[in-house]
Regions:
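Nucleotide/phosphate-binding sheet-loop regions of phosphoryl- and nucleotidyl-transfer enzymes
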Residues: 1-338, 342-345, 380-383, 388-401, ...
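Phosphate-handling DNA/RNA-contact segment within nucleic-acid enzymes
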Residues: 352-383
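Internal insertion modules embedded within essential enzymes
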Residues: 434-500
Length: 500
């Protein structure tokens, strides 16, 4: 029997043909869809999800024919950008990104600025007249490639950019089997899954100069559901600086002040993507020398309260029907809202930051992830307190009752994960907060952004329903209060909560 041909599993993301999310993964699907919508998206192609298992089954090598297909797509990127991958002048740099069918923010690996060498760094410096930018871009690539592909941040990347690309593709495929992916898929009952795709995209540079930056925006507030643009950005930075939480970003209001034209484009982009998704849109963007580029989009992770309000508002706006609105709220989210607690007055505030994951809970502050896992396994309610969270912290986050960080913003991966699983989260509390809180019992209010000394909670389960919950029950054809729900219904936790 002849072996299958895999050359057709490397696909252009040019928006000219519809693609299946299961085949190309969520990231590539969004790139292709946004190209179809004529948004400013850098050129890209994808190695489809079946290649992930094929790569593993082939002993960590790409199947026959795949590399030739990759080179053919690289030639298309070169033509689109007017640059040459590994070329002696006007070098093309690319990002190599993961993307499973189900969104798993930050769980798998990404390599940025790929295609650089010390010689090409100098070419970039001469071409741009900005030696500092070229050096920063090289340093970012060298460290990132060493950490992700070579498992040694001090190791030098291969001298040939094509060898760099082979290595990065393999590293992204291999990241499908890492511990944080397993923990995430187990927590969300996603099963084994079909593997990750690999998206190769032409680089744009938020770290280039004063007219550059990077950020994340949501078409609505993912914590409250309020119908207003929410997001953060960092000038002269690349995307990982925002989502990793290693820096505390600025609100979009400062972008509106400095670059009003770019901000206006983002407002329209959010409307366009939300209308296409018919859901809360989470959009990653880069500004390169005054030009806006959209890198990816997806349905945004949201808090329980936001899930209810967004579902109701989208139904009222005619973007979704009542049945879809009801299906957008999970049993776990309903339980979170039904058990909401409060905070007693006159309790000492021991830390203040940005409330990034609504909810109130109490636990023992622990700064070491291994100790946090051990204490949680023994039955202790753990509040994970960290300078910032890395993807490796995800298993400890899942076993904690809240997360508090020194650095980071509301669009960091820590905030996204916490909102998705209903975990109270406060970010950006200031340097030294995690050390200061370690070992103390604290109450975390992820709505207000405050951390209190000791157990400051009051009893949960207030008698009245939030008006958006009442509206959701009405969309479901149910009356608030009364005998309305089968115990197995996702909205059953609201059954004992009536109107005043």
């Amino acid at each position: 029997m002849s072996s299958p041909s895999w050359s057709g599993a490397v696909l252009a993301l040019d928006g000219t043909q519809p693609l299946e999310r299961e085949l190309v993964g969520g990231k590539a699907y969004s790139v292709n869809q946004m190209r179809r919508l004529r948004l400013p998206v850098p050129s890209a192609f994808v190695l489809a999800t079946p290649l992930c298992a094929a790569y593993q089954d082939n002993g960590g090598e790409l199947p026959a024919g795949v590399w030739d297909a990759v080179l053919a797509q690289l030639a298309t990127l070169e033509q689109a950008t007017g640059r040459r991958f590994g070329g002696p002048s006007r070098p093309l740099l690319v990002s190599v990104r993961s993307g499973a069918a189900q969104s798993m923010p930050g769980m798998m690996d990404t390599v940025l600025n790929l295609g650089l060498t010390p010689r090409l760094r100098d070419v970039l410096a001469a071409e741009s007249g900005d030696a500092a930018w070229a050096a920063d871009t090289w340093d970012r690539f060298r460290r990132g490639y060493g950490e992700i592909v070579l498992a040694d941040p001090d190791a030098a990347p291969p001298a040939d950019p094509h060898d760099q690309l082979r290595g990065a593709i393999g590293a992204v495929f291999a990241s499908w089997r890492n511990e944080r992916v397993r923990a995430y898929r187990t927590r969300h009952r996603l099963g084994a899954g079909g593997g990750t795709a690999v998206t190769v995209q032409a680089m744009v540079f938020g770290n280039r100069g004063p007219g550059s930056g990077t950020g994340v925006l949501f078409s609505r507030d993912p914590s409250t559901g309020e119908p207003c643009l929410f997001g953060e950005w960092l000038p002269r930075a690349q995307g990982d600086d925002v989502v990793s939480g290693v820096a505390t970003p600025e609100p979009l209001s400062t972008l509106a002040e400095r670059m009003p034209g770019i901000h206006a484009q983002l407002v329209q982009t959010a409307r366009t993507v939300e209308a296409d998704l018919r859901d809360l849109a989470d959009i990653e963007f880069t500004i390169d020398s005054g030009h806006l580029y959209v890198l990816q989009s997806r349905a945004g992770k949201r808090s329980a309260a936001a899930a209810v309000r967004i579902a109701v508002d989208l139904a009222r706006e005619g973007l979704i029907d009542p049945a879809t609105a009801v299906s957008r709220v999970t049993r776990e989210q309903a339980e979170t809202l039904a058990a909401a607690a409060g905070v007693r007055a006159s309790v000492d505030v021991v830390a203040t930051g940005l409330g990034a994951g609504p909810g109130i809970t109490v636990g023992l502050a622990v700064s070491d992830t291994e100790r946090a896992l051990a204490l949680a396994a023994a039955g202790t309610s753990v509040v994970l307190v960290r300078p910032t969270t890395a993807p490796e912290d995800v298993p400890a986050m899942f076993d904690s009752v809240a997360v508090v960080t020194d650095l980071g913003g509301g669009t960091s991966h820590a905030a996204l994960v916490c909102r998705e699983i209903g975990l109270p989260c406060v970010v950006g509390c200031g340097a030294g907060t995690s050390q200061r809180l370690d070992g103390r019992t604290v109450t975390v209010d992820g709505t207000s952004g405050r951390v209190y000394a000791g157990d400051a909670t009051t009893a949960g389960g207030a008698s009245s329903l939030d008006p958006h919950v009442e509206a959701l029950l009405e969309l479901a054809g149910l009356a608030p209060g009364g005998e309305i729900l089968d115990p197995g219904h996702p909205l059953a936790p609201f059954a004992s909560r009536g109107s005043p």
